[in-house]
Amino acid sequence: MPEFFTADRYNEQGELIAKGGFDLARFERALKARNINELTSGYQIDFIGKDYAKKQAGEKSATVIVPDVEHNTLAENKNSHNLFLTGDNLDVLRHLQNNYADTVDMIYIDPPYNTGSDGFVYPDHFEYSDRALQDMFGLNDTELARLKSIQGKSTHSAWLSFMYPRLFLARKLLKDTGFIFISIDDNEHANLKLMMDEIFGEGGFVTNVMWKRKKEISNDSDNVSIQGEYILVYAKTGQGTLRLEPLSKEYIQKSYKEPTEQFPEGKWRPVPLTVSKGLSGGGYTYKITTPNGTVHERLWAYPEASYQKLVADNLVYFGKDNGGIPQRVMYAHHSKGQPTTNYWDNVASNKEGKKEILDLFGDNVFDTPKPTALLKKIIKLAIDKDGVVLDFFAGSGTTAHAVMALNEEDGGQRTFILCTLDQTLSHNTIAKKAGYNTIDEISRERITRVAAKIRAKNPATNGDLGFKHYRFATPTQQTLDDLDSFDIATGHFINTSGQLAAFTESGFTDMINPFSARGLGVPGGASGEATILTTWLVADGYKMDIEVQPIDFSGYRAMYVDNTRLYLIDERWGTEQTRDLLNHIGTHQLPVQTIVIYGYSFDLESIRELEIGLKQLDQKVNLVKRY
């Protein structure tokens, strides 16, 4: 870069007036001209839509959470801690920031690879008007058109804009000791690596695993037969450690000796008991006399008492002549294991994944399922037996299958959170012909069938083989318009003419039923109250398996949570209910710190009466009004 260095400058008298050197200002101007922001942001990946993708990561979801009451109340599901969430994973991740931040042990995702044949196009809609987008990001008309060009496209920028906010939000859900594993192929691998370096930090990179997904060499390429794909692994912080794997059969065969009369417990190998003088921490110097009388004085790794314990336990090898330098005997079955490698050539292939689907369904209802052996390996590396696994590209449900199978094998209590879109299946697919309408139906059915298979094999099992199901739905525009017409000051719905408005939401006469499963156009039988309560509980930081206790106040059903919080959503609250509630609190029958009310269900007089009554109590109770 010689063009950025200047020479010393002298005046006409030969006096030095400016020392030469590196011209930082000129260098910065050159960087700016080339749109390189190295000095302030460091090395980073840029793509069309990046600023908008960052904006999306900070937005709140406009969806509500609808419990599948018919499913969740079944005996096998009502006490389950597993979750299946149907909806756009961006919306789901936004909601989960409230109640699952810093709680997930491991994330695995198998996102679309953007190969051109996997059907990926940028699906997210722009949530702002053109003018708002221009004002937000300082775009001119040409730049705005460039931004919106990614919609419905499968370009690299479209894929990165799709993935960025999801990965950004996913990181926040991980514990500080957590890991994320992402399956990907050559097409977006380089871009994904750069994006993950930016979101998780380069220091968060753990490894890039090459998984041999296909054992056969195919003739579908003129150059190279693709047999593997990548699994990128990142840690949220440096606090987590991947677990050791059991010693492989190949390693034991190569490195361990067969059992002998002297060491009959199993395959074993001798390891040195000596240490080098240069090792920090030193060692222990003493004399050891071998069985044949040979004396060795060296720097030993163990204190003399510990050495004598090894001898007593028959864990010291003195060589074939019983006079060699003593070595410790390590049995293979006593080993804590070995680190995994970044090349997995002995894990099940995609062919096994397809066979598992065929065995469960009797047909190939899913095109590209990952094998459960791959997920089991990842899960065992990343979490303990009681960890939480999140997969927000759930696909065929392999992750749930792996969690349930592992728990059955080792008695673990791992739980899963799965999310997938209710994407409609094409009419010519095998799954559609088999009676499935959406991808999420296949995933849930797989979990159900795996559970049945485990129960059939082990009727006495007490593992968690169920799951709670929730749908993430957008209220109708008419419902939103009705909500906007509510005047908090008067407690009435006002139309555009300033007159009292009749509800225009067809079939409903209140602002609860539009949020029922029927009102939102989804199955499951949820009441509007159940949807509102579930959405609020998540927003207030409660897990989705939190126990909710109905409390009766003079014929009015309230919902009590966490021994501190009361939710009043239904209509028909009046003086009698207020009196009953105040009596429960005042006589210490019911500890309450906060009462949350659905403002649309309460008239102003009832709210004022409740506010006055709460202020007269000896204890402070917060009243939160939501509209």
Language-model region placement:
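Accessory, often C-terminal, charged low-complexity segments
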Residues: 1-63, 72-76, 81-82, 90, ...
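Cofactor-binding loops of NAD(P)H-dependent oxidoreductases
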Residues: 87
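Conserved beta-strand/loop positions that form the S-adenosyl-L-methionine
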Residues: 109-111, 392
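Charged, low-hydrophobicity low-complexity segments
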Residues: 125-134
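Conserved SAM-binding loop and adjacent beta-strand
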Residues: 360-373
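Conserved class I S-adenosyl-L-methionine
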Residues: 386-395
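Phosphate-binding glycine-rich loops of NTP-binding sites
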Residues: 396, 401, 416
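Conserved SAM-binding loop of SAM-dependent methyltransferases across substrates and taxa
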Residues: 400-410
